[in-house]
């Protein structure tokens, strides 16, 4: 939790979106977020329309669902993560994002961490990462996220608790400083 509070801006609400390329862990993360007191709501019609436009252009796979968590499938690429994350960061119904780029072969290349970090620059909404397990690749992903200032967790439950801490801190700031997170 401390890393999240140290490196990320507070979430100005408790509505979280989860972006992954592995459906099962995304659902586990959604459950963990809800159990922690966060909301994993449906996306707005505007956001869904943007995602559908990406599908129509061939920028997203047709099998990707528009539900939250968003599952790019095992075929998701670094570019897809970046484009969808940008849409989520712009969405008014999303206060923070949890990204879970699992290192599946072949489309998830080493540049997925950089692509996500570069996309997040300029946004004030918090982003956390999760790559489950203790494999060398998972540990490498988490280390690289941390180098970019994006706290990365080994379990969805830890990531959810950290995001909840950001939402609670944001709520505290809004109560005590109504103009926002000054």
Each predicted region: which residue ranges?
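Short, flexible coil/linker elements and helix-boundary hinge sites characteristic
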Residues: 58, 66, 109-110, 174-177
